[in-house]
Regions:
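Active-site rim/adjacent substrate-binding subdomains
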Residues: 1-106, 118, 124-128
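Short alpha-helical catalytic segment bearing the HExxH-like zincin motif
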Residues: 106-114
Length: 128
């Protein structure tokens, strides 16, 4: 070994997961919700995207994003609006995880976190 030489630590590249399997993980997280919550999510588009937009990335690395008006903030004039949308970002989640088990759990927590925002729960109030 050369004097002063420090080997680079192995670079973590995340876990591998096909888009199809990742979408199944997201769908499974939604399907395991109690039925009463699933019914409330019927008009919410839950989508998988590879990466967040540049604007979202600049605001702080995101694993998911809720876009819409939380249920509790909708007034009587709430109509003629696009459906709410929850985006789950595949590549950041893959990079953040070391194992398939960890990926399943992080996908589940991210889905629950964004659904929490749909129900009007702030980041500070969410336990995850």
């Amino acid at each position: 070994m050369l004097s002063g030489y420090q080997p680079r630590p192995a670079r973590h590249r995340g876990v591998r997961c096909t888009r199809w399997r990742f979408e199944r993980l997201v769908r499974h997280a939604c399907e395991t919700l109690p039925t009463r919550f699933q019914k409330l999510l019927r008009n919410v588009a839950i989508v998988v995207e590879d990466l967040p937009s540049r604007v979202v990335r600049l605001e702080g690395g995101a694993l998911g994003l809720y876009e819409g008006t939380p249920i509790g903030q909708r007034g009587t004039d709430y109509s003629m609006v696009l459906p709410d949308k929850i985006s789950i970002y595949r590549l950041p989640l893959l990079r953040a995880c070391h194992t398939q088990r960890e990926l399943r759990e992080e996908v589940r927590l991210t889905v629950l976190h964004e659904i929490g925002h749909y129900f009007g729960i702030s980041d500070e109030e969410l336990p995850f």
